[in-house]
Curated annotation (Swiss-Prot):
GO CC terms of this entry: collagen-containing extracellular matrix; extracellular region; perinuclear region of cytoplasm
PROSITE patterns noted in UniProt: EGF_2, EGF_3, EGF_CA, TSP3, TSP_CTER
Protein known as: Thrombospondin-3
Gene of this entry: THBS3
Organism: Homo sapiens (Human)
Domain Laminin G-like: 23-193
Domain TSP C-terminal stretches: 727-941
UniProt GO MF annotations: calcium ion binding; heparin binding
Length: 956
């Protein structure tokens, strides 16, 4: 008995201690912070704690669907949206991202890994900010009471000025701009206190962190040591109370016995107990009844799970309406009580969920996963010799595989004519091309030119043969090349002397050599030049105003430097809010003086139009938050969860084709019943198909209805892209600082299919404005000089000035002449690099591009030609690139004449999920990129199949 009394007193004493000790921490329920005055008070507490508290904790319980995420908690400035402190969950890559304002005014980001939170299950997360007021704070992440990740020695947090408090705003997962895409059950912020006390609040033993167990043990020993004397006194007093209590209980037992005897005597005399109000049970079936003195003499307990009411009357709760527990597309059936979900919709697999109550419905939502129909052993039901492409919740049957002809309706049959030398319609140095409608055409191989039926040697690989060919169709590519050794895919010949301008030392035939002629393409023997630029009056579009760039935006023959209306929209430059972009309506929604047509932030004022990362989104509205990695930030992406860099939206409904189930909005679904739509991009609700070939009449020969027939259309499934054209391009300078700054000078020829760079320049890019998903990109590369030995190449998947892939080639080994910030050594040989620069343009990226190898936070070398051979002067090379960003497939081939000299093989990398194309130079002049060709292509090549299996097995 004395041992039990001692244990009780000890427990009582410990409870008193912890109750008093918990008073030096503050617990704030963030989900209840609503009205402005209350938010200001809470913000002031947080600001003070950041300056004075030892630790600050964010404790939350929530549930996220797979691969989803969002902002968990954020403290922002309403005035300029300054991010003082923010914690968000990036479910797609299993991490928690913490960002805060540093003392130097920059935002610092901390990635906490091993945060598997987006799996449809409920998790408790504790984020500990240790020593926020110290010079080097630390962050600890606990997931379900286990230590997941930690970072110490972080940059100090910037103190929040007191004047900012009234303008602070607290956003949680339920109220943030990027909302948590799940359910937040609780969210508290704890100011001060130790991990032991916070662990008691969250009922966590904190596995994996022995320091916390030690803290609890030490605290207990400290309590016993300090309170020993008081404990003895309290136990003595407690024993006296127990003795008195025992005597009182004995007296009560005697009195109860007397009362019981009296009642028994009354029953003998004829007195009977009153009838129970709970018999029969007046409550709802299954609800407990309890006798009470108040009217009506009973009280009913709570309604059973799944029902609601006062206990007497209970009605069913519709879990389907209140919790939405079923997967989209799966019907929710409400029962009495409870609910159940029907089977996952077609194209998905998962469990059939059933249960009772809203809490259960919210915590046990149905999860359905996509089925890869194409790997069912039956090619998804498509023709065995056709291409099957898996999509989310469905699949689509594509064209016949290479070497087969036909379609899904008629079947894909072997194309014997293209694989039998005795019957092939193509030249021996040509290959077959298979069009969408099943037709076959021929194309000469690399190093050969002609119409495909007849091919001849093409030394400079510009698409024109060295000798004229006897073609029956009078194809222009059968005419003799007017520059045999220098690529000129446009065959320009200003003086019509049969020698192309690219290799004619007097291109205009005026008797003055090109190197001395101030009008190379216009005869002007007098060489008159009224202004101070390098162009004579005969060819100067501003003869009296110096303008070496000769830019003419509206193409009216009058250069921008002297044109009063540069864009030709009828509004003078001085009054035009977009002087270089036609916009006769002058719409300016944000009233910043820059019209919407040329405003990089049309809904946010940014009169300076600064765009530090050259992604065409102004710095003011550039969030750099891109969940799917396709180069478009989530706020502007028409499919924010699916990579679609092209942003194609055929029906202009604001939903990209990649995530739109009815691309043309004609009421016929693209792939699922009552579809598939036989003209997916062109409205045809009647689905008329006169020849029964599976392709509707309205898109028979022009699938995207862009007035360019499919065999000539470089993107047959996009009405926005028809021909290869780099006439409109963006210049990106990768080293914008320096005393000897020389920017590239780009000259575009052949209607945008040829680019020449004339200057020995700093690193720079010429980037087209068309963004691609999957793409085939090829061109001829030629250095038309013998005076230099530096870099040239091309780029793809350009997203901004710090994120793109580049294929680059150096002629000889060389150490870069500026050793700051690090020594960079270039090796000869073709290189494929993934640029993911943290700093962006500047000396770090400049040296990283020059260097052959990996450079932290700048460039990763994905592949280099093992031959380690540089390019040769005045020699033409042809590259072929295949990029399928949806699976990370990259392959680069390089030809010298008809000979394949380099092949990267299959490279798997998903750093950039699509983007724009362009060309690259670094300290190399007189580069020609000729006969440029790109083509949209999302079909995954067959050599990816081994990697697909490895990806599914987690080995790549």
């Amino acid at each position: 008995m004395e041992t039990q009394e001692l244990r009780g007193a000890l427990a009582l004493l410990l409870l008193c201690f912890f109750t008093s000790a918990s008073q030096d921490l503050q617990v704030i329920d963030l989900l209840t912070v609503g009205e402005s005055r209350q938010m200001v008070a809470v913000a002031e507490k947080i600001r003070t704690a950041l300056l004075t508290a030892g630790d600050i904790y964010l404790l939350s319980t929530f549930r996220l669907p797979p691969k989803q995420g969002g902002v968990l908690f954020g403290l922002y400035s309403r005035q300029d949206n300054t991010r003082w402190l923010e914690a968000s969950v990036v479910g797609k890559i299993n991490k928690v991202l913490v960002r805060y304002q540093r003392e130097d005014g920059k935002v610092h980001a901390v990635n906490l890994q091993q945060a598997g939170l987006a799996d449809g299950r409920t998790h408790t997360v504790l984020l500990r900010l240790r020593g926020p007021s110290r010079p080097s704070p630390a962050l600890h992440l606990y997931v379900d009471c286990k230590l997941g990740d930690q970072h110490a020695g972080l940059p100090a947090l910037a103190p929040i000025p007191p004047a900012e408090v009234d303008g602070l705003e607290i956003r949680t997962g339920q109220k943030a701009y990027l909302r948590m895409q799940g359910f937040v059950e609780s969210m508290k912020i704890i100011l001060g206190g130790s991990m032991a006390r916070v662990g008691a609040l969250s009922e966590c033993p904190f596995q994996g962190d022995e320091s916390i167990h030690s803290a609890v043990t030490n605290a207990l020993h400290s309590i016993l040591g300090e309170q020993t004397k008081a404990l003895v006194t309290q136990l003595t007093l407690f024993n006296q109370i127990l003795v008195e209590l025992r005597d009182d209980i004995r007296d009560q037992v005697k009195e109860m016995s007397l009362i019981r005897n009296t009642i028994m005597e009354c029953q003998v005399c004829g007195f009977h107990e009153q009838r129970s109000h709970c018999s029969p049970n007046p409550c709802f079936r299954g609800v407990d009844c309890m006798e009470v003195y108040e009217y009506p003499g009973y009280r009913c307990g709570p309604c059973p799970p799944g029902l609601q009411g006062n206990g007497t009357h209970c009605s069913d709760i519709n879990e389907c309406a209140h919790a939405d527990p079923c997967f989209p597309g799966s019907s929710c059936i409400n029962t009495m009580p409870g609910f159940h979900c029907e089977a996952c919709p077609r194209g998905y697999k998962g469990t059939q969920v059933s249960g009772v109550g809203i809490d259960y419905a919210r915590a046990s939502k149905q999860v359905c996963n996509d089925i890869d129909e194409c790997n069912d052993g039956n090619n998804g039901g498509c023709d065995p010799n056709s291409i099957c492409t898996n999509t989310v919740g469905s699949f689509k049957c594509g064209p016949c595989r290479l070497g087969f002809l036909g379609n899904q309706s008629q079947g894909c049959l072997p194309a014997r004519t293209c694989h039998s030398p005795a019957h092939s319609p193509c030249h021996i140095h040509a290959h077959c091309l298979f069009e969408r409608n099943g037709a076959v055409s021929c194309q000469c191989n690399v190093g050969w030119a002609g119409n495909g039926n007849v091919c001849g040697t093409d030394t400079d690989i510009d698409g024109y043969p060295d000798q004229a060919l006897p073609c029956m169709d009078n194809n222009k590519h059968c005419k003799q090349d007017n520059c045999l050794l220098t690529p000129n895919s446009g065959q320009e010949d200003a003086d019509n002397d049969g020698v192309g301008d690219q290799c004619d030392d007097d291109a205009d035939g005026d008797g003055i050599k090109n190197v001395e002629d101030n009008c190379r393409l216009f005869p002007n023997k007098d060489q008159q030049n009224s202004d101070t630029d390098s162009f004579g009056d005969a060819c100067d579009n501003c003869p009296n105003v110096p303008n070496n760039d000769q830019k003419d935006t509206d193409g009216n023959g009058e250069g921008d430097a002297c044109d009063n209306d540069v864009d030709g929209d009828g509004i003078p430059n001085g009054l035009d809010n977009c002087p270089k972009v036609p916009n006769p309506l002058q719409t300016d929604r944000d009233e910043d003086g820059v019209g919407d047509a040329c405003d990089s932030c049309p809904e946010m004022s940014n009169p300076t139009q600064t765009d530090a990362d050259s992604d065409l989104v102004g710095d003011v509205c550039d969030t750099n938050e891109d969940s799917d990695g396709d180069g478009h930030q989530d706020t502007k992406d028409n499919c924010p969860q699916l990579p679609n860099s092209s942003q194609l939206d055929s029906d202009n409904d604001g939903l990209g084709d990649e995530c739109d189930g009815d691309d043309d909005n004609d009421g016929i679904p693209d792939y699922v019943p009552p579809g598939p739509d036989n003209c997916r991009l062109v409205p045809n609700p009647n689905q008329k198909d006169s020849d029964g070939n599976g392709v509707g009449d309205v898109c028979e020969d022009d699938f995207d209805n862009d007035a360019v027939v499919d065999p000539l259309d470089v993107c047959p499934e996009s009405a926005e892209v028809t021909l290869t054209d780099f006439r409109a391009y963006q210049t990106v300078v990768l080293d914008p600082e320096g005393d000897a700054q020389i920017d590239p000078n780009w000259v575009v020829l052949n209607q945008g299919m040829e680019i020449v760079q004339t200057m020995n320049s700093d690193p720079g890019l010429a980037v087209g404005y068309t963004a691609f998903n999957g793409v085939d990109f090829e061109g001829t590369f030629h250095v038309n000089t013998v005076t230099d030995d530096d870099y040239a190449g091309f780029l793809f998947s350009y997203q901004d000035s710090g994120r793109f892939y580049v294929v680059m080639w150096k002629q000889t080994e060389q150490t870069y002449w500026q050793a700051t910030p690090f020594r960079a050594v270039a090796q000869p040989g073709l290189q494929l690099k993934a640029v993911t620069s943290v700093s962006g343009p500047g000396e770090h990226l400049r040296n990283a591009l020059w260097h052959t190898g990996h450079t932290p936070d700048q460039v990763r070398l994905l592949w280099t030609d093992p031959r380690n051979v540089g390019w040769r002067d005045k020699t033409s090379y042809r590259w072929q690139l295949l990029h399928r960003p949806q699976v990370g497939y990259i392959r680069v081939k390089l030809y010298e004449g008809p000979q394949l000299v380099a092949d990267s093989g299959v490279i798997i990398d998903t750093s950039m999920r699509g983007g724009r194309l362009g060309v690259f130079c670094f300290s190399q002049e007189n580069i020609i990129w000729s006969n440029l060709q790109y083509r949209c292509n999302d079909t995954v090549p067959e050599d990816f199949e081994p990697f697909r299996r490895q990806l599914l097995q987690g080995r790549v």
